[in-house]
Amino acid sequence: MDGPQPRALWSSSEKNVSEMSWNFGGEYFRYKGIPFPVGMYSPESLSLAENTSNVRDDDIFIVTYPKSGTNWMIEIVCLILKDGDPSWIRSEPIWQRAPWCETIISAFNVLDRPSPRIMSSHLPIELFTKAFFSSKAKVIYVGRNPRDVVVSLYYYSKIAGQLKDPGTPDQFLQNFLKGEVQFGSWFDHIKGWIRMQNQENFLFITYEELQQDLRGSVQRICEFLGRPLGEEALSSVVAHSAFAAMKANTMSNYSLLPASLLDHRQGEFLRKGISGDWKNHFTVAQSEAFDSVYREQMHGVQRFPWDTSEEDSSPDGQPDPEPSPSPASDDPNPGSSQ
């Protein structure tokens, strides 16, 4: 490990995240070469996630690269497990319903949670829980257009206390393309996980598919989990996992977190919940730089819903007079998409 020495900020027995005192400095450390924010993670918490034997065959893991639809999928799965009844999602914070595997407050430290457990992770496949690969537990991996990911992550970095200041849009874009952001390279992350696609306990789905056909996507997820729903329950899942419903739900919109963790004065956690917002932020030069790296990194990899001729070209129109306009300049409420 190199970089600043992480400090444990709480004991593993503390569970009420919304009432904790957080002291973040925006510093990162590296674990097996990948950057992680100090305070939220530690070498010990990452090693626990990687090496624990606490995996059950009916566990459900929701895995994403940051800002790719994690919370949306958590909401959907929670509703599916309750046959569309929204009582659970309205009474327990989302981070307790689907705790993180790799944080210092680790899901694996809570041994008495009833089955089936939902757990969340941003870990790349090479650091993921080894015991999963010899189990019948299931992973739902959500992918998203990396152009939208970088915009959402830029805004999130402005309000999240544990993350480095993103700097200028150009600086942040370059860091993203080099993998010098939390959890490392988006390209390596998705290429690693999609190798699992032929496994029956792995489902790959995209943010764009959820947006284009939420009902059909929920049916796919139900089939994967072996939990078919009737029409009424299915409609309830769709209605209560919609962006507007999540944004209005205090148990799902992260408004309960302290300002030291999320500075709500600077913006909302659930910002827009749309696809294609990158076109409102990238200059032509930034889009061309992104596309060049994308083509190089993803050569020979399967095509995704965002791999269209439209997405592979620069946004319409001419760049703004400023060579690198701040994305925050056109949004009065900067925050982070789901």
From Swiss-Prot:
Keywords of this entry: Cytoplasm, Endoplasmic reticulum, Lipid metabolism, Microsome, Nucleus, Steroid metabolism, Transferase
Keyword Nucleotide-binding: no
Record flagged with keyword Chaperone: no
Annotated catalysed reactions: an alcohol + 3'-phosphoadenylyl sulfate = an alkyl sulfate + adenosine 3',5'-bisphosphate + H(+); pregnenolone + 3'-phosphoadenylyl sulfate = pregnenolone sulfate + adenosine 3',5'-bisphosphate + H(+); 3beta-hydroxyandrost-5-en-17-one + 3'-phosphoadenylyl sulfate = dehydroepiandrosterone 3-sulfate + adenosine 3',5'-bisphosphate + H(+); cholesterol + 3'-phosphoadenylyl sulfate = cholesterol sulfate + adenosine 3',5'-bisphosphate + H(+)
Catalytic residues as annotated in Swiss-Prot or TrEMBL: H122
A Gene Ontology term for the protein's cellular component: cytosol
Disulfide bonds: none
Record-linked InterPro entries: P-loop_NTPase (IPR027417), Sulfotransferase_dom (IPR000863)
Biased composition (Low complexity): 327-338
GO biological process: cholesterol metabolic process; sulfate assimilation
Broadest EC class assigned to this enzyme: transferase
Main location: cytoplasm
Residues annotated as binding substrate: W95, W100
Annotated localization: Cytoplasm, Cytosol; Microsome; Nucleus
Region entry Disordered, spans: 301-338
Tissues in which the UniProt entry reports expression: Expressed at high levels in epididymis, intestine and uterus, and low levels in brain and hypothalamus. Isoform 2 is most prominent in the brain and spinal cord, with modest expression in the lung, skin and spleen. Isoform 1 is most prominently expressed in skin and small intestine, with modest expression in muscle and prostate.
Coiled coil regions in record: none
GO molecular function, one term: sulfotransferase activity
Superkingdom, natural source: Eukaryota
UniProt: 3'-phosphoadenylyl sulfate binding residues: 67-72, 144, 152, 207, 241-246, 271-273
EC number: 2.8.2.2
Family that this chain belongs to: Belongs to the sulfotransferase 1 family.
Described function: Sulfotransferase that utilizes 3'-phospho-5'-adenylyl sulfate (PAPS) as sulfonate donor to catalyze the sulfate conjugation. Preferentially sulfonates cholesterol. Catalyzes sulfation of the 3beta-hydroxyl groups of steroids, such as, pregnenolone and dehydroepiandrosterone (DHEA). Cholesterol sulfation is approximately 10-fold higher than for pregnenolone and 20-fold higher than for DHEA. Plays a role in epidermal cholesterol metabolism and in the regulation of epidermal proliferation and differentiation.
PANTHER family for the chain: SULFOTRANSFERASE SULT
Protein name: Sulfotransferase 2B1
Organism annotation: Mus musculus
Gene name of the record: Sult2b1
